[in-house]
Regions:
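Hydrophobic alpha-helical transmembrane segments
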Residues: 38-52
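Cytosol-/stroma-facing membrane-proximal "stalk/adaptor" domains immediately downstream
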Residues: 144-152
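N-terminal membrane-targeting/pre-transmembrane regions
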Residues: 1-38, 120
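Membrane-embedded alpha-helical segments of small multi-pass membrane proteins
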Residues: 35, 51, 55-58
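Conserved beta-hairpin
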Residues: 55-88
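Short, structured motif recognition centered on aromatic/hydrophobic residues
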Residues: 12-17, 65-67, 108-115
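Non-transmembrane, membrane-adjacent beta-strand/coil modules in membrane-associated proteins
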Residues: 76-137
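Generic beta-strand structural signal
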Residues: 9, 67-69, 97
Length: 152
């Protein structure tokens, strides 16, 4: 069995390791605004950005992507208050890699998973980062995990 860089195997589940890249930049940016509010003695800015910083960090910490090979499903938890979404492998359609550039500089790369639900195609985000290569490596590892179990 291959060792995975982005996943940790626990029983029949493959749990994606936390990826702080893009989310941590957002949290640090909001923390900078909160600190700027301290220097300018603006309590509204301190409270607003302080609370947003904490909420965003908790949201990043709660994000999960699990591949359960016993139940043959993806389990995706995004956001602070959303319930985990369970997607059977049989409903999986494909992955989408979205790359956002500003003036030839890549600012965000996100990996989305498309699946069928009630005869409609739905989309759910899996991961975000700064490089296409890291997202492609993640796709390759997911394919290695689900490929032996007859994805098609």
């Amino acid at each position: 069995m291959a060792e995975f860089k982005k996943f940790e195997k626990v029983g029949s589940q493959f749990i994606m390791k936390r990826q702080y890249g893009f989310g941590l930049v957002v949290v640090i940016g909001m923390l900078a605004f909160a600190i700027g509010g301290i220097y300018n003695k603006n309590t509204a800015v301190i409270w607003i950005f302080g609370i947003l910083t904490v909420l965003c960090f908790i949201s990043i910490w709660a994000q999960q992507f699990i591949i359960d090979m016993e139940k043959k499903e993806f389990i995706i938890k995004n956001g602070l208050i959303n319930k985990p979404l369970q997607i059977p492998l049989s409903n999986f359609v494909n992955f989408e890699l979205v790359k956002i550039k500003h003036n030839f500089i890549t600012t965000n790369v996100s990996l989305n998973l498309y699946y069928m639900k009630d005869t409609k195609e739905k989309c759910m985000g899996i991961a975000q980062g700064f490089s296409t290569r890291s997202m492609q490596n993640l796709i390759n590892e997911i394919n290695e995990i689900i490929q032996p179990n007859e994805r098609y």
